[in-house]
Amino acid sequence: MSLVSKAAVVLAGAAVAGFGVAGPASAAGTLHGAIALSDSTGTVASAVNYDDPGAADAAANSHCGVRDCRVVLHFTDGCGAVAQGVDRKVAVGWGPTQAEAEKQARDVLGPSAPPFPDLGSASPRPATIVLHACTANAA
């Protein structure tokens, strides 16, 4: 699924492991990035600094390295982020800066309580950023 606007989506997922890779940077102009996720393993990967959105998507899927990887976020001239709650839900966010992308991903999830049984506190906790990636021309 590709998101080209400032939208975020909540995804059900397993534990997330992230990988980021930069692609061939453009001297000027529009740069694209993508984040891919595997539903079976929770692996996430990114690819940034591509002149073509399709190339960014293909690179993110390739770097993810799992058969069921799919692009969950496409961004242009900015940043993307993946957050995971203690309940294992995952959300993505996009923004012109890393901070804005991370905030959006966290805000989509909000605080979450750990699944039962949990040996620690059952109090809701904020989501953790597991991957962020920015194009070279991000703000």
Ranges and model annotations:
Residues 2-139:
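Helix-coil modules at protein/domain termini and other flexible surface or pore-lining loops
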